[in-house]
Design a protein with these regions (language model features):
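Residue-level signature of outer-membrane beta-barrel architecture
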Residues: 30-32, 74-76, 128-131, 167-169, ...
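Transmembrane beta-strand segments that form the barrel wall of outer-membrane beta-barrel proteins
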Residues: 42-46, 136-150, 175-179, 207, ...
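Outer-membrane beta-barrel "beta-signal"
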Residues: 207, 329, 370-376, 402-417
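Residues that define the transmembrane beta-barrel architecture of outer-membrane proteins
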Residues: 34, 62-68, 119-123, 157-161, ...
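Repeated loop/turn-to-beta-strand initiation elements of outer-membrane beta-barrel proteins
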Residues: 38, 79-83, 133-137, 172-176, ...
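Outer membrane beta-barrel
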Residues: 72-104, 113-192, 209-213, 293-295
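Outer-membrane beta-barrel translocator/channel fold
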Residues: 93, 173-196, 246-322, 326, ...
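Transmembrane beta-strand segments of Gram-negative outer membrane beta-barrel proteins
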Residues: 31-48, 79-87, 173
Length: 417
């Protein structure tokens, strides 16, 4: 595989599209169209964030917006080497906001005027090639990997430009490798050079694999390098143990080792991150406990436009500051057991301590989250998803801002074919 091709998806996409059209017109029996599918994902998102400290730059951030995401996924042309083409279109519309209420992450705003945009959008294409049980995708990507995870917590999902090869030739083994060159943030219409913080890089290379030894046990390893910024190793283990009496214990262990690379454009990177989650499950009940421990001189690094793959990634905070130790207690319940299918409840409390950030040497931050979600089960609004999210975030020793937050999210997916 030519690494230059992965780094230049914009140049390859027109050629791949022309190739796909030629292959399709030459083969009326091709599955390019018959195996295709399309859907529109609609999300209505309201956020009210009330800053609680007296010296806050804003008294509150409050925005309301409507998002549309259209996904078209083709099948593959016939033959040993199959070709396909996917398309992604995203549109965000402002329903309510203002310069003094900006900054929820729903809408982009002007750097000087601070005026939220009335709309923003993105169109992405992804060419794909399939050989046996291996697929190469080049173009617009939304990866879900430990070292590169796209963000989908606001109106529109973030995207990356690059190439991704996924192979499942061996039963139980999934191998991923690729290169990302640009990122489009969740509240942006433009692709920018990939980076971390204010530092930019030419590319992010990654490779790794996950192997399922059994339905109950899997092990993963990934490596990622953001050129001239940082290098990162990841090791993860997932295990589910039946305990009898309808109980099971799920263990999720993750370890990252992150160091600087080359010129270290983002400054010195030195971080070890061990995090774990243990969940006891019985019927509709799930009780979880986590522990996340960071060591080293820097915060845990992750790509702009992405999320950190950590167990204490919660509604508002990530708990990934330098030297931070954090724990979480969480409870989930599915009301289907009480004859109310579609209704679920989640509440959790997360506590982080010993933070080093700027002039703060022993900072603390806590967050309490509650989610209530209902999916309508029948009628004309069947499958409409309604979620209320409530957040209380507090910090100590001058670490950061305090806030109370409510989010109301309505989601619906319409299958076109």
């Amino acid at each position: 595989m030519n690494p230059v091709s992965i780094a230049s998806p914009k140049h390859l996409l027109p050629a791949m599209a022309s190739l796909g059209l030629g292959l399709f017109t030459c083969s009326v029996q091709a599955d390019f169209i018959s195996d295709s599918k399309a859907r529109i994902e609609m999300r209505n998102h309201y956020i009210n964030r009330d800053f609680r400290q007296a010296n806050a730059a804003q008294s509150k951030a409050e925005e309301w917006a409507q998002g549309f995401t259209a996904r078209i996924e083709s099948g593959y042309t016939e033959g040993t080497l199959g070709f396909g083409l996917d398309a992604l279109g995203e549109l965000g519309l402002k329903l309510d906001s203002s310069p003094d209420r900006r900054g929820t992450g729903l809408l982009p705003f002007g750097p000087n005027s601070h005026e939220p945009a009335d709309e923003f959008s993105e169109l992405g294409l992804t060419g794909k090639l399939r050989l046996s049980k291996s697929v190469l995708k080049i173009g617009t990507l939304q990866p879900l990997l430990p070292v590169a995870t796209y963000n989908d917590t606001r109106l529109l999902g973030s995207t990356f430009q690059g190439g991704l090869l996924t192979s499942q030739e061996i039963s139980g083994l999934t191998v991923n490798a690729g290169r990302l060159t640009e990122a489009n943030l969740r509240d942006s219409s433009s692709n920018d050079d990939i980076g971390y913080g204010a530092a930019r890089s030419d590319h992010f290379d990654f490779a790794g694999a996950s192997y399922a030894f059994s339905p109950q046990l899997s092990l993963s390893y990934y490596y990622g390098k953001l050129e001239q910024i940082y290098r990162q190793h990841y090791l993860g283990l997932l295990h589910t143990q039946p305990l009898g009496g309808g109980f099971s214990l799920r263990s999720d262990l993750r370890y990252f080792d992150s160091r600087g690379d080359g010129a270290e454009r983002a400054g010195r990177i030195d971080n070890r991150n061990f995090n774990s989650m243990f969940s006891l499950i019985k019927g509709p009940h799930k009780i979880s406990a986590t522990w996340q421990q960071l060591s080293g001189d820097s915060a845990f690094p992750f790509l702009n436009g992405g999320d950190p793959y950590v167990v204490n990634l919660v509604t508002y905070n990530t708990y990934t500051r330098a030297e931070e130790d954090s724990w979480q207690l969480r409870y989930d319940y599915d009301f289907a057991a009480m004859g109310l299918p579609g209704l679920t409840f989640m509440t959790r409390y997360t506590d982080g301590r010993h933070v080093k950030a700027g002039t703060v040497d022993n900072g603390r931050e806590t967050e309490r989250d509650t989610d209530i979600t209902y999916v309508i089960q029948s009628g004309p609004l069947k499958d409409l998803n309604i979620r209320w999210r409530n957040v209380t975030f507090r910090s100590g020793n001058g670490l950061t801002t305090d806030l109370d937050e409510n989010r109301l999210i309505l989601g619906y997916t319409l299958a076109l074919w």
